Amino acid sequence: MKRWMLVVLIAIALAAVVLFVGFTQIKLDALQEPGHLETVFATQAKHLLVRWSSREGIPPAPANLQASIEEGDKLYGTDCSMCHGPDGHTPTDSGRWMYPRASDLTSFTVQRYSDRELFWIVKNGIRLSGMPAFGKVESDEHIWNLVHYVRTLKGSEHPESGGDTH
């Protein structure tokens, strides 16, 4: 019985600490950058959820990679560059003022996603991040073309980049 009470007291104390840290470190306003704890927690949670969500239901990629990249370049100009910028590294004013700001597509954080995970992100979007879902306006083939084009951006990675915000 004493052991059970100790476990309950520890759980209550831990919950109190988590709530205190949560309420003091996580802000709702978008006037300043999120704190380190919030950024780490949100990024890790997002990566885990994207990995889990992309396990099934992803159609096969187009066979001709070079043609897919060329088509993806065209689509990028109309679908993605308005936020991520023409180079995928320097967001436009719209992308900079999103909260969180548009991701640097050349960053390690974005490029470490698998092709399946990137496909899932482009198709489904990321709720509350500014990343829209293209699944209702673009075909699966077009989404694969965008994924293949984004992969070509990794050669221009900028190490000083913060990287992932979506």
Regions found by a protein language model. Name each.
Residues H84, R151-K154:
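Protein kinase-like catalytic domain
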Residues D93:
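Winged-helix/helix-turn-helix nucleic-acid-interaction surface
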Residues W97-R151:
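Extracytoplasmic electron-transfer domains, predominantly the class I c-type cytochrome c fold
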Residues Q66-H89, L118-W120, H166:
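Sequence/structural segment immediately N-terminal to covalent heme-attachment motifs in c-type
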Residues P159-H166:
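Extracytoplasmic/periplasmic copper-protein system
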Residues W4-E70, G135-V150, H166:
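Periplasmic c-type cytochrome electron-transfer domains
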Residues G88, R127, K154-H158:
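Activation segment of ePK-like protein kinases, specifically the conserved APE
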